[in-house]
């Protein structure tokens, strides 16, 4: 892609998200979401491949449907209450419609069906943008309106997403689909606590973005997209293989890695709110997710691929890929748990 076009598209992504962040009027927020969608569409279709075009088409149709629902919900709310302000979403029908539309936008279960298929058709860097940056603007709107939305709807979306994210990833052989189901499960953790402690949702979103960025960058560095090729990565780069395994365990929420922090705090908050059954369900759903992360780690570090020839290990050769972003995200993914008290002080 032409670098000038790429710069314009990335700037438009930033502009759309910033516009949604800064707006208090429904039409401006909707416009920001649409700029985001239109900016990422050419990035998704830049590789002239049938799968990429199919993924782009699915994504565009899904986002257009969600955008139409948001516009309809906001006009319904304005018709019933006379208010266009985002925080004055008081009509029950508009509330439900709006939350359903945003759930479709970020891929919450049961509106998640597009997410694994779209992510599978993209390259890893575009998939990274879709899994991280594209979640920011919808979450800004959800956080602003969470207190007006039916708590039962939020709880159902959260529990369903964590269960579907766990079950869906169990039998997958494609790493991008596994990361898509991982994203769905993490979205569920954020939504379940948003009505009780929005600052914990922001903390979970921040750690999710860091961990997912580290996962995508490590997989891109090792040139791996399938579980079957994970077994060959140790001969190419043993250190990168060990790092990838730790990043995946952090995504699964295993202590003492960073991913344990948001899950622990969210379970603590749910218990404080006298919701032990929901907290137990979420913890068990996290165990299901942890299984497929452990399966990936087993394939990477505890299996040896068939090798009949005595070949020299290529891991001493210099890599041509940029490793600074990978190093930063990996360090944050593995080592932020001891800083939990400081992070809580900053977020509360």
UniProtKB/Swiss-Prot annotation:
Its main location: mitochondrion. Its EC number is 7.1.1.2. GO terms for biological process: mitochondrial electron transport, NADH to ubiquinone. The chain crosses the membrane at residues 3-23, 60-80, 96-116, 149-169, 178-197, 202-219, 246-266, 274-294, 326-346. It comes from Carassius auratus (Goldfish). It comes from the Eukaryota. InterPro entries: Complex_I_Subunit_2 (IPR050175), NADH_DH_su2_C (IPR010933), NADH_UbQ_OxRdtase_chain2 (IPR003917), ND/Mrp_TM (IPR001750). Belongs to the complex I subunit 2 family. Keywords: Electron transport, Membrane, Mitochondrion, Mitochondrion inner membrane, NAD, Respiratory chain, Translocase, Transmembrane, Transmembrane helix, Transport, Ubiquinone. It is found in: Mitochondrion inner membrane. One of its GO terms (molecular function) is NADH dehydrogenase (ubiquinone) activity. It is a multi-pass membrane protein. This is NADH-ubiquinone oxidoreductase chain 2. The keyword NAD applies. GO terms for cellular component: mitochondrial inner membrane. It catalyses: a ubiquinone + NADH + 5 H(+)(in) = a ubiquinol + NAD(+) + 4 H(+)(out). Core subunit of the mitochondrial membrane respiratory chain NADH dehydrogenase (Complex I) that is believed to belong to the minimal assembly required for catalysis. Complex I functions in the transfer of electrons from NADH to the respiratory chain. The immediate electron acceptor for the enzyme is believed to be ubiquinone. The keyword GTP-binding does not apply. Pfam families: NADH_dehy_S2_C, Proton_antipo_M.
